[in-house]
Amino acid sequence: MPVHLNQIIDVKKMPLGSVTKICFCGDHDDLTRLQIQLYEALGERAHLCFSATDCLEVLPVGCNKGAALTVLTQHLGLSLRDCMAFGDAMNDREMLGSVGSGFIMGNAMPQLRAELPHLPVIGHCRNQAVSHYLTHWLDYPHLPYSPE
């Protein structure tokens, strides 16, 4: 059941135990201030991340794309080192950091680039950069890739 922001009076009383995800959508500066308040109120009881500049997510601790990919690879008998992932937002951070080949999109949030400076940046999503990269990788796996 959706809860509207004006119904949350005390962020310390957020119903974290029965919630799988809370999204706050709005102005990025407002959400950044809210993120600080939520960190102060919730501490390590929740995972906070931006999935877009205008969307702040509150998730259970340990609930992220990296953790999901870990479960999937274990189920399939694969290694994370053999996986490739592409991302553009802070909700991709754990996933990109856990795989053997992580790639940051050209349109990625600056915070993601700053937190994972060792990962290569490929082209913009609007130019189908993932498709271009994968085509290059499949056709010429040993040649370096140059976006766009």
From Swiss-Prot:
Which of UniProt's keywords are assigned here? Answer: Hydrolase, Magnesium, Metal-binding
UniProt record similarity statement: Belongs to the HAD-like hydrolase superfamily. Cof family.
GO MF term list:
magnesium ion binding; phosphatase activity
* Top-tier EC class: hydrolase
InterPro entries given for it? HAD-like_sf, HAD-SF_hydro_IIB, HAD_sf
Q: Which PANTHER family match?
A: HMP-PP PHOSPHATASE, PTHR47267
The protein's role, per its UniProt record: Catalyzes the hydrolysis of 4-amino-2-methyl-5-hydroxymethylpyrimidine pyrophosphate (HMP-PP) to 4-amino-2-methyl-5-hydroxymethylpyrimidine phosphate (HMP-P).
Q: Which Pfam families match?
A: Hydrolase_3
Q: Which SUPFAM superfamilies match?
A: HAD-like (SSF56784)
Quote the EC number.
Answer: 3.6.1.-
| Cofactor(s) essential for the protein | Mg(2+)
Please tell me where Mg(2+) binds in this chain: 88
* Protein name in UniProt: Putative HMP-PP phosphatase
Q: Does the keyword Cytoplasm feature in the UniProt annotation?
A: no
Lineage, top-rank taxon, reads Bacteria
**Residues in coiled coil:** none
